[in-house]
Amino acid sequence: SAGLLTQEWSAVEDLLAQMSLPEADAQRDAEMVSTATGGGRMNQESIEPPNNLPPRERKAGCKNFYWKGFTSC
C-alpha cells in the first residue's frame, strides 16, 4: 500500500513538473513524444491561426452619466 501511494505521488509530482515547464519546453516534449509514437509533427503555425494584425489599442469608453445609467459614445 505504501509503495502504491509513493508511485501515485511521484506521478502527481511528474505531472506538476510538466505543467510548470515553459511553453517551449512543453512543445519540445510533445514533439518528442509524437515522433517517438510515429505520429506526424504539427508545427505551431498549423495549431494557431496566424496573427498578422497588430494588437488592438484599447479605446477608453465614454462614460456619460444619464439618470438611467451610463451611456456609451
Curated annotation (Swiss-Prot):
A UniProt-annotated Pfam family: Somatostatin
Region (Disordered): 23-58
Propeptide segment residues: 1-45
This protein's record includes keyword Zinc: no
S-S bonds: 62-73
Main location: secreted
The UniProt record lists the keyword Disulfide bond: yes
Superkingdom in the source lineage: Eukaryota
CC terms in the record's Gene Ontology section: extracellular space
Alphabetical GO biological process terms: regulation of cell migration
Localization per Swiss-Prot or TrEMBL: Secreted
A GO molecular function held by the record: hormone activity
Coiled-coil segments on the chain, per record: none
InterPro entries, sorted: Somatostatin (IPR004250), Somatostatin/Cortistatin_C (IPR018142)
Keywords annotated in UniProt: Cleavage on pair of basic residues, Disulfide bond, Hormone, Secreted
Homology family: Belongs to the somatostatin family.
Described purpose of this protein according to its UniProt entry: Somatostatin inhibits the release of somatotropin.
Name of the molecule in the record: Somatostatin-2
Source species of the chain: Platichthys flesus
